[in-house]
Amino acid sequence: MLEIGSPNALFFRTNTTCNNLLRELQKIWVEIGETETEKDRMLMELERECLQIYQRKVDEAANSKAKLHQSVASIEAEVASLMAALGVLNINSPIKLDKGSKSLKEKLAAVTPLVEELRIQKEERMKQFSDIKAQIEKISGEISGYSDHLNKAMNISLTLEEQDLTLRNLNEYQTHLRTLQKEKSDRLNKVLGYVNEVHALCGVLGVDFSQTVSAVHPSLHRTDQEQSTNISDSTLEGLEHMIQKLKTERKSRFQKLKDVVASLFELWNLMDTPQEDRTKFGKVTYVVRSSEANITEPGILSTETIEQVSTEVDSLSKLKASRMKELVMKRRSELEDLCRLTHIQPDTSTSAEKSTALIDSGLVDPSELLANIEMQINKIKDEAQSRKDIMDRIDRWLSACEEENWLEEYNLDENRYSAGRGGHVNLKRAERARVTINKIPGMVDTLIKKTLVWEEDMQKSFLYDGVRLVNILEDYKLTRKQQEEEKKRYRDQKKRQDLLLTQRESIYGSKPSPRRSSSFRKPNGFNISNGNGSVPPTPRRGSVGTTTPDVLLTPRSYSGHHRQNGYFKEVRRLSTTPLNYVAMQKEDTVSTTYTSIYSSEPDSPLQG
């Protein structure tokens, strides 16, 4: 029995059907009356048509088989390609596992799910690559500054199929993306830092910040989110150039304002401007004491501020010009006062009379004249500093001379040893004065040495009120020596007079002198006279007419004696070691009495 669906059963069923149809056809032919030739012809035609149908079916089956083979091969190639692109190495193809036991359709059905899965993985991987590449290209465009052009190119590049979709390649893209993101962050921070610096500089300079940064790139001052901040190299370079430009402008304005404020201070000080008038410029006065980098107050270097200060300087300059003569006279007076204090002769080229004449005639700019006087004041101050040690020694010497003068007057006081009020104080002072007086020669010698050293160092003479100090000191030493010699001669003559008086008393006896009452010391000075001029006058402090050698001149009295200097009218007269003038006065009176006995006139000279 034939199995249903088997090829033999199909062939048997076909033959049976064909035979039945052939018998029915032959029966029809008989009824029609077809000839045998016609029957053979139609049978041959029928057989040919059947063969054509079989052949067509065979061809269709062969084509179907070829297509299946091609599909299987294509799928295998696609699987291999997807696995290679995705970098999948742990998946085996079902076709390769069982090559002979399965039909083509079974093989195709077995590999289709794997292909679908690999296709899904590829799409997801391509999406990851697309996202990363989009971010990379966007950041690269922001860095390079050509974002619009790169966005168009990015859309084209993303449509192309990616050949390498492995995780290794994806990690490389991600690493590159992170690098670009870090660079973007650094650039953004750098741009923001530059923008903040520009903002600070614009604030100090009083410049419009929005216009300044917009000139570099419009995105730097946009409040909307339509365009992100540009971080390209050109923007960074533009900001750096703008910062350098603003710093240069700040330096220029700072120096200009500093000069103007310095001029303002100078005018304030010259014109004694009250503090309330200076207060309104208080915010700019600290510029003189500050460095450029520390200037941060908004608008402090704006053109308006500089113009405001400049206007004030111009106003004060005009006022100064009208008061310049007064200022010149004032500074000249200060110069003369300083010269008086330091005993230095002022420069006569800027004297009050000459300065007034020059200003009135218009031959000299008052500012130049004032600057010249200021220079002289500074010069006097510097010279006074170098003269300080010598001037201190001069003061100590003059103080010793004052003590010597006091001791001279003290010795003329007949009541100096009385027990009256203050007597013991004067005795102590007299002792100290004698010690000080003994140091005067050493003081003078040291002062001469110091002065000569100063003159050698400074290469000029040390002048005291216009007279060379060394000459004054040498004259002082000479005069002091002459006085010592005069006193010595006086003492020798006094001894001879005492001896003569003793001899006369032994011969004639002592007799009261009728002139003793007139020999007492006068209030205005002490004068010793023997009636015949043989006894030289002793030094005294009163304004009694005496010769120059009898008076020791200090620097001040020397200047007044030789130069008639109006600044120094005080005459200091010094003596050497003091004598007992009271005792000498009494003895001189007695001597005069006895001398008058042998003279034809009461005041006739002694008869040797």
Swiss-Prot record:
From what superkingdom does this record's organism come? Answer: Eukaryota
Q: Does the keyword Nucleus apply?
A: yes
Which keywords has UniProt assigned to this entry? Answer: Cell cycle, Cell division, Coiled coil, Cytoplasm, Cytoskeleton, Microtubule, Mitochondrion, Mitosis, Nucleus, Phosphoprotein
Q: What segments bear the compositional bias annotation Low complexity?
A: 510-523
Could you list the residue ranges forming a coiled coil in this record? 164-186, 368-388, 467-503
* Positions of region (Disordered): 501-565
Q: What's a single GO CC term here?
A: mitochondrion
Q: Where in the cell is it found?
A: Nucleus; Cytoplasm; Mitochondrion; Cytoplasm, Cytoskeleton, Phragmoplast
Kinase in keyword set: no
Q: What ranges does the record list as Polar residues composition bias?
A: 526-535
PTM Phosphoserine: list the residues.
513, 604
In its UniProt record, a GO molecular function of this protein is: microtubule binding
* Site features described as Microtubule binding, chain residue numbers: 419, 430
Gene Ontology biological process terms from the UniProt entry: cell division; microtubule cytoskeleton organization
Annotated function? Microtubule-associated protein that mediates the formation of a mesh-like stable and dense network formed by individual microtubules (MT). Confers MT resistance to high concentration of NaCl.
PANTHER family, alphabetized: 65-KDA MICROTUBULE-ASSOCIATED PROTEIN 6 (PTHR19321:SF0), PROTEIN REGULATOR OF CYTOKINESIS 1 PRC1-RELATED (PTHR19321)
Q: Give the UniProt family note.
A: Belongs to the MAP65/ASE1 family.
What does the subunit comment say?
Forms a dimer. Binds to polymerized centrally located endocytic MT.
Name of the featured protein:
65-kDa microtubule-associated protein 6
Q: Which source organism?
A: Arabidopsis thaliana
Give the classification, highest ranks.
Eukaryota, Viridiplantae, Streptophyta, Embryophyta, Tracheophyta
